[in-house]
Amino acid sequence: MVGLEDDTERERSPVVENGFSNGSRSSSSSAGVLSPSRKVTQGNDTLSYANILRARNKFADALALYEAMLEKDSKNVEAHIGKGICLQTQNKGNLAFDCFSEAIRLDPHNACALTHCGILHKEEGRLVEAAESYQKALMADASYKPAAECLAIVLTDLGTSLKLAGNTQEGIQKYYEALKIDPHYAPAYYNLGVVYSEMMQYDNALSCYEKAALERPMYAEAYCNMGVIYKNRGDLEMAITCYERCLAVSPNFEIAKNNMAIALTDLGTKVKLEGDVTQGVAYYKKALYYNWHYADAMYNLGVAYGEMLKFDMAIVFYELAFHFNPHCAEACNNLGVLYKDRDNLDKAVECYQMALSIKPNFAQSLNNLGVVYTVQGKMDAAASMIEKAILANPTYAEAFNNLGVLYRDAGNITMAIDAYEECLKIDPDSRNAGQNRLLAMNYINEGLDDKLFEAHRDWGWRFTRLHPQYTSWDNLKDPERPITIGYISPDFFTHSVSYFIEAPLTHHDYTKYKVVVYSAVVKADAKTYRFRDKVLKKGGVWKDIYGIDEKKIASMVREDKIDILVELTGHTANNKLGTMACRPAPVQVTWIGYPNTTGLPTVDYRITDSLADPPDTKQKQVEELVRLPDCFLCYTPSPEAGPVCPTPALSNGFVTFGSFNNLAKITPKVLQVWARILCAVPNSRLVVKCKPFCCDSIRQRFLTTLEQLGLESKRVDLLPLILFNHDHMQAYSLMDISLDTFPYAGTTTTCESLYMGVPCVTMAGSVHAHNVGVSLLTKVGLGHLVAKNEDEYVQLSVDLASDVTALSKLRMSLRDLMAGSPVCNGPSFAVGLESAYRNMWKKYCKGEVPSLRRMEMLQKEVHDDPLISKDLGPSRVSVTGEATPSLKANGSAPVPSSLPTQSPQLSKRMDSTS
């Protein structure tokens, strides 16, 4: 903290008022008061008249009288002093000094003359000589108060000079000498306060400032600096009180107004972090009252409004913060976050680039720019940005997570998992990396061991211990009463999950199964509003929960008396597993959005069917499996799909195989099998569509891999992401046969393919993710296209391609075949689903609650084994919950790149002090 030394030249000298020294001695004769009309020319009357003229600032007239007197009596000490004072007011210091010196020569103990000599020395900057003169005056007359006051001033100035020269202790000594001379001299206390503040002896500093304010109640600077000390100590309320006292005596004191704005901004952040966002906003606004262009208050208002989901207001205040502080890279960064969440990626890129033009090594903006480039499929540019972020901050855990997302999207699962694990080394509690790692492991899991199950279980146990669980509910245990079903998901928009949740929302019997939707959609679209209107029209309840803390959502679920809570996301983007971990509903279920166990001991059931998870499956689950009578999915086609196009092979003269699955599913083994098929079917072609193919290096790597497998690149067409759903669906007109992926099969892509008349070849496996295609194709009536192994997969594909006429016939009938199958029979599906819910509820009413048994086992294991307790002990979970999931083609969107990171909220600016 830097304080301004009290410049005693700003102090009005107590010695001179209207040119006259307070307490100067009169001559031995009494000076009478003359009337203006009376002409006095001699003796003491003349001296008195001259003194009166001088007191009335008529210095020229007074000077003439003094000079006239001295011509007659050169030894008149009072006349010499009076003449000196008049000359002093005319800035004739040398002549004035001669007059005072002559007076001293005539009267060596004249305190008034000695004091005025000191004043002249001080005006010339000769502080030592000034002090000596004042000391002589006091030696001549110890009771002469003006000399004492002047000596205190000059000793204070000497102290300041010594301190500025680096002689702090000697300076302090001078301040104390000043106070010894004049114990009521406030500036000496004030300057001691400044010195002690610089020495970080804040208790001493406060004591000195308080004494300065006591001696001079209007001492604004002292109040201001007291406020600075309290603010730096974290006592914001006391700091604000001091600034208020300062501004009460000096309303236009700019330093204090600025400091008040800083303190109010910090107090706003403090109360906001304690949970009172509204009061925080009030303090930020009050800060702007004191400093209307204070960028930090505007910035923090942007943060607060963002947390309140008032994004338009947040944008306004970030823009203002940047306007008033063009060096505020954080404001640009956070603007980028908001624009990205609104899908305005070009504007987001512009904001991040602006932030980086201010702070080239700003790790957050480097990371966030990499996130946007990843979303856009610009993998090379994304990798460059994220690697720069890591270089700028090697311990930036989420940057490693985002690198993993990039590798996953580029199809390099091994490197993705390595990156996630690197993130977890830095931040073991990174929720994004932990869940992304689990998801990534599904892409290469063939069910040969239990490693993936153990990874889910361990994550689930650890995560559950971070949340308090409800263990009892007020829900009436009546097995036959209407049941309240809660669906919770961020994917009630044009997203893969939406195609499978629409049937239940539409066809539930709302008289027996009340539906409550908890929508965590980041950005609602037309489908969101259509779903909401449909639910409300049928008597259900729709609640938007985006941005609400997961534990608060759990409280909402409990207050709504949800009987069965169904989460639809698993370990994918923006999931609400934190709510599920609190166990707010008596029965909890996972379904649709994730092809594996959640790992949470608080989830009772996972919905599936006997083909996706056969009764003899070796795959382990934390949840108890509930198999629906037909397919565990019911697909509602997009109304924008358009008509089925003729088989392209009829006009092309060759068969085109294709896949619109993401690259993460197209593993090296999948490419080997596809290459075998293409090589076995002369002149056939392969069309693959996915987002990263807008990147040349990804395209080239993909083509090179196929060429190494014997497939010429000229036989391969690679398409990037197609934005509009109608165009995406019509792109199926390019292929004759769809090739499924393994061991992570397609879901939405398979349904889309079949609906557009394109038969799909799939392969059965040992895990749920592998068998989704088996369930879909079998229930549509295409069980003959399910292979048992790779060789059969190749042969089925080759055989299907060998008869174009039969292929064409199948294509033109496939939509009707699918529409009449259980896969698209919404009413029938809803009945089966409701039956499953009813059975779950009946079990609960009987006291059969799988999750309670697991929780008891978990608590027993933790109690019996201290190592488990240590491993699973409470720890902080870092959740970055604002990244928007990209539209996925088949059923599960990964937990996204961690959020474009928002910058810290605390004010950055240092206090100024008086």
UniProtKB/Swiss-Prot annotation:
Pfam families: Glyco_transf_41, TPR_1, TPR_10, TPR_16, TPR_8. The modification Phosphoserine is found at residue 35. It is an enzyme of class 2 (transferase). Keywords: Biological rhythms, Cytoplasm, Developmental protein, Differentiation, Flowering, Gibberellin signaling pathway, Glycosyltransferase, Nucleus, Phosphoprotein, Repeat, TPR repeat, Transferase. It catalyses: L-seryl-[protein] + UDP-N-acetyl-alpha-D-glucosamine = 3-O-(N-acetyl-beta-D-glucosaminyl)-L-seryl-[protein] + UDP + H(+); L-threonyl-[protein] + UDP-N-acetyl-alpha-D-glucosamine = 3-O-(N-acetyl-beta-D-glucosaminyl)-L-threonyl-[protein] + UDP + H(+); L-seryl-[protein] + GDP-beta-L-fucose = 3-O-(alpha-L-fucosyl)-L-seryl-[protein] + GDP + H(+); L-threonyl-[protein] + GDP-beta-L-fucose = 3-O-(alpha-L-fucosyl)-L-threonyl-[protein] + GDP + H(+). TPR repeats lie at residues 43-76, 77-110, 112-144, 152-185, 186-219, 220-253, 261-294, 295-328, 329-362, 364-396, 397-430. GO terms for molecular function: peptide-O-fucosyltransferase activity; protein N-acetylglucosaminyltransferase activity; protein O-acetylglucosaminyltransferase activity. GO terms for cellular component: cytoplasm; nucleus. Residues 19-37, 894-907 have a biased composition (Low complexity). GO terms for biological process: cell differentiation; cytokinin-activated signaling pathway; flower development; gibberellic acid mediated signaling pathway; negative regulation of gibberellic acid mediated signaling pathway; protein O-linked fucosylation; regulation of reactive oxygen species metabolic process; rhythmic process. It is found in: Cytoplasm; Nucleus. Homomultimer; via its TPR repeats. Interacts with GI. Interacts with TCP14 and TCP15. Interacts (via N-terminus) with APRR5. Interacts with CPN20. This is Probable UDP-N-acetylglucosamine--peptide N-acetylglucosaminyltransferase SPINDLY. It comes from Arabidopsis thaliana.
